[in-house]
Amino acid sequence: QLRDVTLVPRPVNRPVEMWQAIASGKSIPFMVQHGIKGMVTMNGEQITRMMFRQFRDEAAKIGRNLALGEDLTWGGGLYLADSIEEAMERVRPYHDERFKWFAPFGFVRYADDQGRPWGTPGAPVGVPTLEEGLRQKAWLLGPAEEVIGRLRELEAEYPGLEQVMLHWAEGMPADEWKDQLRRFAREVMPAFQPRAAEAAAAGS
């Protein structure tokens, strides 16, 4: 059995963090027992809420008292533009290309209004349109203030959440995605830096 892995060069930060995507709740008990952190990405709001709560509750069963969202990453699609309508128009081809591949395999992590995941007994199976993705809050679309507002909602609901992952929509040219990241850094990230600075000052 494999016990040790040597990495060259040696990681700067140790112990090395392990992150694993959470596709269903079945892997969560194993993850919390072994200190593996979770990535909950491209999920509807209700699925995300269920996964985050399950992760916290499973950790509590073994004596790990985590704040809601702690040791987790929230991931969503991103397209910044001057309006939501412009963002949707520009990202739609890439969004649709993504679900042409994912949807036939059942990789649509949305729920109905009762919290039932699509495709489970009693729940309807919808069409994963971009409009539905926006309604499910799996996408950050529009001007910076819209994106900041949604991230503030996540911050309020999940006080332990410190990591956000931005999804590079399949098929989007690399230069276009780099422009999106630059715009995110320029227009969105400054809204969150003062709080980080205040926390650092309080801890010193």
For the regions a language model picked out, list residue spans one by one:
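Active-site-proximal loop/turn and secondary-structure-junction residues that shape catalytic pockets
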Residues: S24, G44, L78-L80, E170
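Internal, glycine-rich beta/alpha segment that forms the wall or movable "lid"
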Residues: Q1-H34, R49, R53, I62
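Hydrophobic faces of well-ordered beta-strands that scaffold small-molecule active sites
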Residues: M18-A21, I36-T41, E70-G76, E162-L166
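Conserved, mostly hydrophobic/aromatic
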Residues: M18, M31, F55, A87, ...
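An alpha-helical appendage that flanks or caps ligand/catalytic pockets
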Residues: Q1-L7, Q46-G160, Q193-S204
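Glycine- and acidic
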Residues: I36-K37, L134-K137, M165-G171
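Glycine-rich, proline-tolerant flexible connector loops at the mouths of alpha/beta enzymes
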Residues: M42-N43, M165-W177
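Short glycine/threonine-rich loop-to-helix capping motif typified by GTGT followed
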Residues: L80-E85, P173-R183
